[in-house]
A protein has these predicted regions:
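Conserved core of the PLP fold type I
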Residues: 60-188, 205-206, 213-218, 222, ...
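Active-site C-terminal subdomain of aminotransferase-like
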Residues: 222, 253-273
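Conserved glycine-rich beta-strand-loop-beta hairpin in the small C-terminal domain of fold type I
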Residues: 279, 295-304, 316-329
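N-terminal small-domain helix-loop-helix segment of the aminotransferase-like
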Residues: 2-95, 102, 281-284, 390
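Active-site PLP attachment segment
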Residues: 219-257
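Structural signature of PLP-dependent enzymes
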Residues: 256-262, 281-304
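PLP-dependent enzyme catalytic core of the Aspartate aminotransferase-like
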Residues: 155-156, 223, 335, 342-351, ...
Length: 390
């Protein structure tokens, strides 16, 4: 099977945040959207056809999450990541961000310290502060063009009474695929100080060769018993609008507390199309993901080459995973406000300002390259032309 990732899909007017929410969320509708983390590719036909078949039935009552939802995910995780998961460990949740918030509510108390590792996916911050927990930072370190964990500081924070670590694995926005050794070192610190590991693995399928994703909970049973993992087909298969994710918890006590909180909030029902899409994605998605990663890999190479030849004041932090690229723009000598205005209004390219990802994000921008190559090249040309106005 072959997928046409070069095909241009007109998303304007489709009520999508990425294209139709530019004015509301970024402040300009007159820019090329290369920001929010969904792709401009068609969802695979075997998914859309299954949704259409269900829609043709014409009745959309309360859905039953059947065996296929669970077994397809279990088989996918074993096939793609060599992680053996049991059905009882899996809980549905309407999105990874809700799952992170529920895990915080279920396992910590107001005033508890929770570690995050910025620059990182910004909803992690509000998942802590919205619930009156205390946010503590273990800032990542940019070393040889890669964001790395500071294990000495992590040890200090864990020893100081932190109750939970929220991990982005693989990392968003930096694209680091944490190695087995890095994860073992991180987990050893957390186990030593009884810190729960909340591992957001939504980007786990989007890893470039030769790197390999390691689920934290696959490292050992002891580590698994201290870990809550979130996964979803949304980034991989462009299904974010269907609000479907899964939470995997081996520890029965942690799972009981999570499910109790989920039940109290009455948000565990899900939607009929999300169930179908998730099952089809995990049953039939191997060739799609393989071809997608080959295409995205070519986009990365195109980006690196163009920036090296034309944009000397920008450095690409080469991603090991995700369709999101962390751009080091500090040599441009601009404040964060000036940087955002330059790209949004002068270059007319809408990206996420690095500062929104917390400490360490200052002077950076996050670019979404999950688009046809011609769209990526258009954005790069616009940025090059904009430098003439500096």
């Amino acid at each position: 099977m072959s997928f046409d990732f070069d095909k241009i899909i007109d998303r304007k007017g489709s009520a999508c945040i990425k294209w139709d929410g530019m004015e509301k969320f970024l402040g300009s509708a007159d820019a090329l959207p290369m920001w929010v983390a969904d792709m401009d590719f068609l969802t695979p036909a075997y998914i859309t056809e299954a949704i259409a078949l269900k829609a043709s039935h014409g009745v959309f009552g309360y859905p039953l999450r059947e065996d296929g939802y669970f077994t397809s995910l279990m088989q996918w995780l074993q096939r793609r990541h060599q992680w053996n998961v049991e059905r009882d460990w899996i809980t549905f949740c309407p999105g990874v961000v809700p799952a992170v918030n529920i895990a915080v509510l279920a396992n910590t108390l107001p005033g508890d310290k929770i570690i995050v590792q910025p620059p990182v996916y910004f909803p992690f911050f509000t998942a802590v502060t919205d619930h009156k927990r205390n946010l503590v930072y273990n800032n990542l370190v940019l070393r040889d063009g890669r964001l790395c964990m500071d294990f000495d500081n992590l040890e200090t924070l864990a020893a100081d009474g932190a109750k939970m670590l929220i991990l982005s694995n693989p990392h968003n926005p930096g694209g680091s695929v944490w190695t087995r050794d890095e994860l073992l070192q991180m987990a050893a610190i957390c186990l030593k100080h009884n810190v729960i590991i909340l591992s957001d693995e939504i980007h786990c399928d989007l890893v470039y060769k030769p790197f390999k994703h390691t689920p934290v909970a696959s490292l050992s049973q002891e580590i698994s018993n201290h870990t809550i993992t979130t996964v979803a087909p949304s980034k991989t298969f462009n299904l974010s609008g269907l609000s479907t994710a899964s939470v995997i918890i081996e520890n029965s006590n942690l799972r009981r507390k999570f499910n109790l909180q989920l039940d109290h909030l009455h948000i565990g029902g899900g939607n009929i199309f999300g169930n179908i899409a998730s099952e089809q994605a995990y049953l039939h998605g191997d060739s799609y993901v393989d071809e997608l990663m080959d295409y995205l890999g070519k986009n990365v190479e195109m980006l690196k080459k163009y920036v090296a030849e034309n944009l000397p004041n920008i450095e690409v932090i080469e991603p090991e995973a995700t369709f999101l690229v962390w751009l080091d723009c500090r040599k441009m000598g601009m404040s964060d406000e000036e940087l955002n205005k330059f790209f949004l209004y002068t270059a007319r390219v809408g990206m996420n300002p690095g500062a929104m990802f917390g400490p360490g994000g200052e002077g950076f921008m996050r670019m979404n390259i999950g688009c046809p190559a011609i769209t990526l090249m258009q954005g790069l040309h616009q940025i090059k032309k904009a430098f003439a106005f500096i």
